[in-house]
Amino acid sequence: MDNVADRVKKVVVEQLGVNEDEVTNEASFVDDLGADSLDTVELVMALEEEFDCEIPDEEAEKIATVQQAIDYVSAHIPAKDA
């Protein structure tokens, strides 16, 4: 199974319609990848579905980069899903 980082990046590519090479760990969803507020909501929903977890709104607001998404998912999903 792909690792968490690869799975997060795959979701970002699918949701934002960007090239895989644009999705670096440091990339900001809004500033670098062109996401708007609706895109970020849909991205969080897609991450929740991919990892079978719930990301509370107050936590989702703190996830602005690919690395922050990877870190959040890594810390909050059961090991069997990682």
UniProtKB/Swiss-Prot annotation:
Carrier of the growing fatty acid chain in fatty acid biosynthesis. It comes from the Bacteria. Residues 2-77 form the Carrier domain. Belongs to the acyl carrier protein (ACP) family. GO terms for cellular component: cytosol; membrane. It is found in: Cytoplasm. Its main location: cytoplasm. HAMAP family: Acyl_carrier. InterPro entries: ACP, ACP-like_sf, PKS_PP-bd, PP-bd_ACP, Ppantetheine_attach_site. Pathway: Lipid metabolism; fatty acid biosynthesis. Keywords: Cytoplasm, Fatty acid biosynthesis, Fatty acid metabolism, Lipid biosynthesis, Lipid metabolism, Phosphopantetheine, Phosphoprotein. The modification O-(pantetheine 4'-phosphoryl)serine is found at residue 37. GO terms for molecular function: acyl binding; acyl carrier activity; phosphopantetheine binding. This is Acyl carrier protein. The lineage of its organism: Bacteria, Pseudomonadati, Pseudomonadota, Acidithiobacillia, Acidithiobacillales. GO terms for biological process: lipid A biosynthetic process.
